[in-house]
Curated annotation (Swiss-Prot):
Gene name, Swiss-Prot/TrEMBL: CENPH
Signal peptide: none
Key words of the record: Acetylation, Centromere, Chromosome, Coiled coil, Isopeptide bond, Kinetochore, Nucleus, Phosphoprotein, Ubl conjugation
Name listed for the protein in its UniProt record: Centromere protein H
Homology family: Belongs to the CENP-H/MCM16 family.
Residue span of region Disordered: 1-34
Residues joined by cross-link Glycyl lysine isopeptide (Lys-Gly) (interchain with G-Cter in SUMO2): K67
Subcellular location(s) per record: Nucleus; Chromosome, Centromere, Kinetochore
Pfam families cross-referenced by the UniProt entry: CENP-H
Function according to Swiss-Prot or TrEMBL: Component of the CENPA-NAC (nucleosome-associated) complex, a complex that plays a central role in assembly of kinetochore proteins, mitotic progression and chromosome segregation. The CENPA-NAC complex recruits the CENPA-CAD (nucleosome distal) complex and may be involved in incorporation of newly synthesized CENPA into centromeres. Required for chromosome congression and efficiently align the chromosomes on a metaphase plate.
GO cellular component, one term: nucleoplasm
GO molecular function: kinetochore binding
Organism: Homo sapiens (Human)
Length: 247
């Protein structure tokens, strides 16, 4: 990236006006390449930090007897974050290489144009081709810029999707936690002393009711009344035959 200023200084007496026009795109591309390098460095640092956090979480989990739902959720979120960062790093690397190739093409075209202008003023056809090549390079840079804009939008969509995924996982964790709490509360209620007393009283009432049923059945049968012909008495007998435990 330092060869261009030296070449421009050497050619400045011959054609200073053409240099001003041809120096613009490489400077813009150079600035974009530097920005891509800074971004890639930041992403690499974030990936290293995230991997370190994952190792710490794994060591903490291995030290415990079993994993809690919160720890499992944190591991999944960290793994998804690492995967997204790695994908983003690869995209930045590809974009950086494309920008570097475009910058090299611009430099080569500018250098060839200046050399051809010095060597021969009669090669107009070749000069036209070189100018056409420069125009094509500008169109390529424009298309690449549009492609990078689309990549930025795609990255935003992926971030939103990750946020929605994390929100849904957090909601599921809340639901599971609430279910576990309800189960614990139910178990504690079943094991409480008050529930035991209520159950004992209920069993006592069932036994008393069963004894009363048997007494009434024996009275009706002992009276030798034809209860099948009396609807009211028949209904009473049928009720007495029901098992109280099944009610």
């Amino acid at each position: 990236m330092e060869e261009q200023p030296q070449m421009q200084d050497a050619d400045e007496p011959a054609d200073s006006g053409g240099e001003g026009r041809a120096g613009g795109p490489p400077q813009v591309a150079g600035a974009q390449a530097a920005c891509s390098e800074d971004r890639m460095t930041l992403l690499l640092r974030l990936r290293a930090q995230t991997k370190q956090q994952l190792l710490e979480y794994k060591s903490m989990v291995d030290a415990s007897e079993e994993k809690t739902p919160e720890q499992i959720m944190q591991e999944k979120q960290i793994e998804a974050k690492i995967e997204d960062l790695e994908n983003e790093i690869e995209e930045v690397k590809v974009a950086f290489e494309i920008k570097k190739l475009a910058l090299d093409r611009m430099r080569l075209s500018t250098a060839l144009k200046k050399n051809l202008e010095k060597i021969s003023r009669q090669s107009s056809v070749l000069m036209d081709n070189m100018k056409h090549l420069l125009e094509l390079n500008k169109l390529i840079m424009k298309s690449q810029q549009e492609s990078w804009d689309l990549e930025e939008k795609l990255l935003d969509i992926r971030k939103k999707r990750l946020q929605l995924k994390q929100a849904s996982e957090s909601k599921l964790l809340e639901i599971q936690t609430e279910k576990n709490k309800q189960k614990i509360d139910l178990d504690s209620m079943e094991n409480s002393e008050r529930i035991k007393i209520i159950r004992q009283n209920l069993q006592m009432e069932i036994k008393i009711t069963t004894v009363i049923q048997h007494v009434f059945q024996n009275l009706i049968l002992g009276s030798k009344v034809n209860w099948a012909e009396d609807p009211a008495l028949k209904e009473i007998v049928l009720q007495l035959e029901k098992n109280v435990d099944m009610m």
